[in-house]
C-alpha cells in the first residue's frame, strides 16, 4: 500500500475530466472509477445558475472542487475530516490562482462555512457503517447520522434558487449490504 501510494503521489493520476493529473497524499480518497465524474462534468456544462460560490463537502483529492473551478465557479469552499486531504490539495494548488479560488477547511460536513451558496456538492461514503471507522474508511462507510445531519445543515446554507448535487453509489444495494439506501 505504501509503495503504491508513493507512486500515485509522485507520478500523479490522470482523471479524464481534469486538465492536470492529481497527486493524492497517502490515506486520501481518490476516484478509481470515473462514471460519476463524467456525469457531474456533463451536469456542470448544462448548469445555468449563478457561479459565484459553491461548497464541496468531503473533497478528498479535490476532483469535484477542481471540476467546479474548471467550469467557471469563482470560489469553492471545501471541507474534509482528513488532515492529509487539506495538506495534499494545499500543496497541489501551491500559490497558483487555484489557491485563491478554493478555500479549504478541516472539519465535519460544512466545517466553518456558514455562508449561503448557489451549489452544494457531496460525494458521500457509500456503505453503511458496520463498525467504528477511522482514516480512509471514513470515505467508504457512513454512520446513521450522516445524511440527516448533512441535509439539515445544507438546508441552512443553500440559497433559495440554489442546487444540491449528491453523487451517491448504489454499491450497498448491488452487494446486498443494505436494502435501505
Regions found by a protein language model. Give the residues of each.
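Terminal helices and disordered tails flanking the catalytic cores of nucleotide-processing hydrolases
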Residues: 3, 21, 31-34, 42
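N-terminal auxiliary segments of SAM/dcSAM-dependent transferases
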Residues: 1-13
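Short, aliphatic-rich beta-strand segments
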Residues: 20-26
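Mobile active-site "lid"/loop adjacent to the S-adenosyl-L-methionine
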Residues: 83-85, 124-149
Amino acid at each position: 500500500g505504501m509503495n503504491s501510494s508513493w507512486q500515485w503521489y509522485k507520478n500523479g493520476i490522470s482523471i479524464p475530466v481534469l486538465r492536470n493529473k492529481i497527486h493524492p497524499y497517502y490515506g486520501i480518497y481518490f476516484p478509481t472509477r470515473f462514471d460519476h465524474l463524467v456525469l457531474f462534468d456533463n451536469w456542470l456544462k448544462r448548469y445555468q445558475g449563478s457561479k459565484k460560490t459553491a461548497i464541496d463537502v468531503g473533497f478528498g483529492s479535490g476532483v469535484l472542487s477542481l471540476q467546479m473551478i474548471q467550469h467557471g465557479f469563482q470560489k469553492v469552499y471545501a471541507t474534509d475530516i482528513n488532515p492529509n486531504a487539506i495538506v495534499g490539495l494545499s500543496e497541489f494548488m501551491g500559490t497558483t490562482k487555484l489557491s485563491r479560488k478554493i478555500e479549504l477547511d478541516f472539519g465535519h460536513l460544512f466545517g466553518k462555512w456558514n455562508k449561503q451558496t448557489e451549489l452544494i456538492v457531496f460525494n458521500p461514503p457509500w456503505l453503511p457503517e458496520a463498525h467504528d471507522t477511522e482514516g480512509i474508511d471514513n470515505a467508504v462507510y457512513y454512520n446513521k447520522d450522516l445524511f440527516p445531519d448533512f441535509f439539515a445543515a445544507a438546508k441552512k446554507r443553500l440559497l433559495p434558487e440554489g442546487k444540491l448535487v449528491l453523487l451517491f453509489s448504489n454499491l450497498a444495494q448491488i452487494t446486498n449490504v443494505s436494502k435501505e439506501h
